[in-house]
Regions:
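Catalytic, metal-anchored helix/loop core of enzyme active sites in primary metabolism
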Residues: 1-160
Length: 160
């Protein structure tokens, strides 16, 4: 399964610290269309829940004059060690990305709870990914992959 049928080599990651642009697509004529919004996840979640429709929002929208400059940087692979793991999981296919996300959610939760350090997040996720199985895609396999990755990552963190 490929995101919009796009091969992983064609997906570019950039760091956009203002969090205004949520996605961009470059077309064959080199033009780019971007989805912009306030820097929180409420609009993305709302859209996912109401797709294919849209719901009216009565709060203030994006004020472009206040935003100012939009900046982009190439990711520092050392600062974002799980970025390459995401690329590799995408290439693997099956439930690999699901397992990565589940392990990351567990590790980040443990970091937020104060149980592990920031650097332990990637160590726990990498260790969990080395131990979990990758299944073909089905509704059952997605739930199984999430459960397994969560359990394995929890056990790894307990032993850190």
């Amino acid at each position: 399964v490929r995101l919009f049928g796009v091969e992983p080599e064609r997906i570019e990651v950039v760091i956009h610290r203002q969090s205004i642009i949520h996605s961009m697509v470059e077309y064959i004529d080199n033009t780019v269309i971007a989805q912009l919004g306030l820097p929180d996840m409420r609009s993305a979640v709302r859209y996912a829940l109401t797709f294919p429709g849209r719901t009216e929002v009565r709060s203030a929208g994006l004020d472009f004059a206040s935003v100012g400059t939009l900046t982009f940087d190439r990711p520092d692979e050392k600062a974002f060690p799980l970025l390459n793991a995401g690329r590799e999981a995408y290439k693997m296919g099956g439930t690999a990305l699901c397992s990565l996300i589940a392990a990351d959610e567990r590790a980040v939760g443990e970091f937020i709870a104060g149980n592990i350090g920031f650097g332990d997040i990637s160590r726990a996720v990498f260790a969990a990914l080395d131990k979990v199985k990758v299944y073909g895609i089905s509704e059952e396999s997605i739930y199984e992959a999430r459960r397994e990755a969560d359990e394995v990552c929890s056990e790894i963190i307990k032993n850190m």
